[in-house]
Amino acid sequence: MNKFIIKVIFILHICSLLSCSYTPIFSEKNYNFGIEKISFDKNGEKDINRIIKNRFNLVQQVNDKQETKYSISVKTTKEREIISKDSKGDPVKFELIVSAIYTVLKNNEIILDRNIERKHIYDNNSDKFKLEQNEKIIIENLSRNISDVILASIVTLDDN
């Protein structure tokens, strides 16, 4: 009898968690604005620009008919610095810094101008292929984070 009660409570708990209708904030594609144009500095980091552009293309396609339209201009940079070295002078830890300076325009008027910087520290790897793959994953994650911050700043602009 005791095991039966525990199982029932467990099942009810799982059912209540699954039915809470949690959705991430950026999965909702019903924003009150549209993205008219996204432009990137030609000297910016191509991989970072591609990731940010792909993330905003989703918003741009869904919200094409909105009255409020914004244009976004982005300049991205990437730096890799050596944080620590071993006794031989070989790098042990790296820091990858991804930054973006972005401007949001509405009717050709600047309404927001900000700088975002995201950092990640990681260990060196003797296998350079794995190190390069790890760096690509880190760059993608930092770039997604930056695009989420840009989108959040536009959402808060539109709420005001």
Regions found by a protein language model. Give the residues of each.
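Short hydrophobic beta-strand segments
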Residues: G34-N43, S71
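Short extracytoplasmic
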Residues: K42-L58
